Amino acid sequence: MASVKAVSSAAPLALRIVAECPVSKARACSLTLPHCAVNTPVFMPVGTQGTMKGITADQLEDLDCQICLGNTYHLGMRPGPDLIEKANGLHGFMKWRRNLLTDSGGFQMVSLVELSEVTEEGVTFRSPYDGKEILLTPEQSIAIQNSLGSDIMMQLDDVVSSTVKGPRVEEAMHRSVRWLDRCIAANKNPDRQNLFAIIQGGLDAELRKACLKEMTKRDVPGFAIGGLGGGEEKDDFWKMVTLSTDHLPREKPRYLMGVGYAVDLVVCVALGCDMFDCVFPTRTARFGSALVPWGSLQLKQKQYAKDFQPIDPDCQCPTCRRHSRAYLHALFKSDTAAMHHITIHNISYQLSLMRSVRQSIIDQRFPEFVKEFMKRMFPSSSQYPSWAVEALQSVNICLS
């Protein structure tokens, strides 16, 4: 039986380390938040404007989703923080009884790069809705998130694409540290809302270390690893992840932003990450792609027209209990309900994967789980991604 270790953290968040892998950096924790406890490692589905695309709040709760995301930038535009505050925050507005994490709006510096300009004051966006210019400062980002009432808030950071090099990366890192201090000062609800810092520094190890050194001086409830998953080489990606977890405090949660592919999740748990989010499972569902332990099924393809198996015979989600691949294939031709059913399955797959990862850590068999996972995901070991093999070897998990 794994030993239970109690670790204190700043209220209103508490992190209890339930078990640690004796070989790698993987760990299973219980994260106490205002609306419920969150078991980690955890995958968090993303709802841009207060809802998941293709799934309701009740259905998410039925899948035992303990925490999901909302987007501060888009919610700040539509329907606006004043209206949401009148509905008793985003929880009341979307009738969600579990935890919410809101991002800061900073990622839109990359995703809407042609519509934005960054200065020390903040980031100026040209609204994609009406073309008006909007200045988002650290103070305004926190004010919006205070109105939304999320359980975890993210600092506004200066985000640059992971493929950018040169002085802009260093500028963004130092500015993110300064903006963190402004966000901390602006938070009106430190007793109810947890503000996470976001580590920046691009693919430069020295800049990452400098950011880690400065940000960990601040007594924030948790830390996110930002600026990755944006098209950089996977060899660079995993090295920045493990460098970050090496320097982050053991007693605080570690959130790797924007990561959602199954292999990436498993490898990055091994590297010491606790929390993940990505639009991938919902976005790919809209194109008819269903996630399975051996990869994905493209249900629009003709080969599934007469296939009466569920998406995954071992899956217990509502979609797999009721519908066949053939039915979903046929539904795609005439009804958007197919996307809805596949979205439910894909989110269930991600949540179930993380529950299995967690249980393997508690049972002290995480390295064995990783080997079994990789064998099922890839037809042969020769097809294992070299970056994943190297990353796992760095934490003493050998796949050969």
From Swiss-Prot:
Which of UniProt's keywords are assigned here? Cytoplasm, Glycosyltransferase, Membrane, Metal-binding, Mitochondrion, Mitochondrion outer membrane, Transferase, tRNA processing, Zinc
The record's listing under Pfam families reads: TGT (PF01702)
SUPFAM superfamilies given in the database record: tRNA-guanine transglycosylase
User: So where does queuine get bound?
Assistant: D103, S104, G105, G106, F107, D157, Q200, G227
EC supergroup of this enzyme? transferase
Q: Show the disulfide pairing.
A: none
Q: Where does Zn(2+) bind?
A: C315, C317, C320, H345
- The active-site annotation reads D103, D277
List the catalytic activities from the record: guanosine(34) in tRNA + queuine = queuosine(34) in tRNA + guanine
Quaternary structure note:
Heterodimer of a catalytic subunit qtrt1 and an accessory subunit qtrt2.
Question: What protein name applies here?
Answer: Queuine tRNA-ribosyltransferase catalytic subunit 1
User: Per the UniProt entry, what species is this protein from, by scientific name?
Assistant: Danio rerio
